[in-house]
Amino acid sequence: MLSKTHIMFIPFPAQGHMSPMMQFAKRLAWKGVRITIVLPAQIRDSMQITNSLINTECISFDFDKDDGMPYSMQAYMGVVKLKVTNKLSDLLEKQKTNGYPVNLLVVDSLYPSRVEMCHQLGVKGAPFFTHSCAVGAIYYNAHLGKLKIPPEEGLTSVSLPSIPLLGRDDLPIIRTGTFPDLFEHLGNQFSDLDKADWIFFNTFDKLENEEAKWLSSQWPITSIGPLIPSMYLDKQLPNDKGNGINLYKADVGSCIKWLDAKDPGSVVYASFGSVKHNFGDDYMDEVAWGLLHSKYNFIWVVIEPERTKLSSDFLAEAEEKGLIVSWCPQLEVLSHKSIGSFMTHCGWNSTVEALSLGVPMVAVPQQFDQPVNAKYIVDVWQIGVRVPIGEDGVVLRGEVANCIKDVMEGEIGDELRGNALKWKGLAVEAMEKGGSSDKNIDEFISKLVSS
């Protein structure tokens, strides 16, 4: 019966959205569920998919040349939804004809009216959230009009159910850029959750106990994380060390060889995510010199469009202490014995990965949910420090260097490392056989099979 149970995944086509969904898919496949993941053709053709238990199908997201790229987020996602819905109907019929009818569609929460779309296609629907429960609660309260983002002038703190008191700088930052209605779209993630059959969050019960309970009082949410490869956690899935889905090629050999030559706990790993940073030239310069002035060895991921912001003087001085790469295998790096801290933008995936591997953090949040995650890193889980921002919105190199030193040495560093190791143990506990997330996944499968 289980082998006939078929789940189709529809990720949003970005590395930070596809990776956790792939981890969930791999775990379900290992437990005997048939899995198909639907990807844009342009992405599937250029990516590395490394799991033989995962079937793939393609959807084209090409926009008509005459129409161009829709200007508003609602218009853009409306076009995407139309293309997905039209193609999914054919894919579902194909799977049914092949003897593997789809029982459930797991759809990234960013897609509009996901549950409605699934039910119109005659299939159960489950939104998949790639941010924390805390951020979900904040976005939902903003969606209800109980909170404005960006906050009103004069607002210094915000009190919300299940959430610790938030300062103005702890709230999500929405840089609208191309899509001026982006925040409205983020709020609309909650528009049809009351109709969802399941709702998945990449978190675990002990990490966000109160936040998950509050969301559970609103909708049928299920905590299924931390979603990172099994060999870094519970080791139930044999040889599961890779993301399984990668948009970028990392020079694994040179990164690990460089780290192998360094003393245990002596290296700062710095990375600010898989999309273009919002750093101006001044900001980039302060981060760069802050790393150098900390006097610690560092490995820094600087994606290609950003590398031009690094001065020739910095690059020359960094040769002795630093390795600057365009991409690296983050999990392998974070788990390496030489890593002592992680300077991060506080994206949710990076936060969960560092916490699960017991690495304390230097928080440099930029936008979206990142300030909220930084608040939890520093004040709730107590596994990092946050670099203060100057009046002009730019960090100062001296503050960057001092924060690195706080995490890497002394009593503060010892306390942060101890807390990080505690959370690492709890992350493993959640995913090992009989752990909270493992049980949640098993109960979900059982209910799906019997429905």
Curated annotation (Swiss-Prot):
InterPro entries: UDP_glucos_trans. UDP-alpha-D-glucose binds at T130, Q330, H345, W348, N349, S350, E353, D369, Q370. Expressed at higher levels in roots than in leaves. GO terms for biological process: response to molecule of fungal origin; saponin biosynthetic process; terpene biosynthetic process; terpenoid biosynthetic process. It is an enzyme of class 2 (transferase). It catalyses: (20S)-ginsenoside C-K + UDP-alpha-D-glucose = (20S)-ginsenoside F2 + UDP + H(+); (20S)-protopanaxadiol + UDP-alpha-D-glucose = (20S)-ginsenoside Rh2 + UDP + H(+). Induction: Induced by methyl jasmonate (MeJA) in roots and leaves. Induced by A.niger mycelium-derived elicitor, thus improving ginsenosides production in adventitious roots culture. It comes from the Eukaryota. GO terms for molecular function: quercetin 3-O-glucosyltransferase activity; quercetin 7-O-glucosyltransferase activity; UDP-glycosyltransferase activity. Belongs to the UDP-glycosyltransferase family. This is UDP-glucosyltransferase 74AE2. Its EC number is 2.4.1.364. Component of the dammarane-type triterpene saponins (e.g. PPD-type ginsenosides or panaxosides) biosynthetic pathway. Glycosyltransferase that catalyzes the biosynthesis of ginsenoside Rh2 from protopanaxadiol (PPD) and the conversion of compound K to ginsenoside F2. An anthocyanidin binds at H17. Keywords: Isoprene biosynthesis, Transferase. The active site is at H17, D108. Pathway: Secondary metabolite biosynthesis; terpenoid biosynthesis.
